[in-house]
Amino acid sequence: PAEALTDSEFAAIYKEAQKYVGTPYVWGGSTPETGFDCSGYVCWVYNQNGYDVGRTTANGLWNKSQHISEAEAKPGDLVFFEGTYDTPGKSHVGIYLGNGMMVSAGDPIKYANIHSSYWQKYLSGFGRLSK
């Protein structure tokens, strides 16, 4: 199985991720210059940290990740949601920060509690990427 990130690996991912908090949501956006959608943001952050995930959708990231339980989820893993809009499969992805918190490209990119009344009803799984 894929290993959880070390503290220093997570620190590097978090440092990149927090640079863009407050950036507006842009459908299809995948760079700091264009703005980000949820999967564009996650792909950018991980690609900048030595991963090779390319540019894919939330469902594509789900397919590239090892599926883990919430109890196994560690900071730097991905958290997935279904039904946030009308698309088959996973419709939203965020970077799990631990303690029920994530950072993701809503409008704008922001921190959120995955167990809030909104996110809890769409929560559908956790994944761990491998380098």
Predicted regions: what they are:
Residues 31, 83-85:
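Structured beta->alpha junctions
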Residues 51, 67-70, 85, 89-131:
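Aromatic- and glycine-rich peptidoglycan recognition patches
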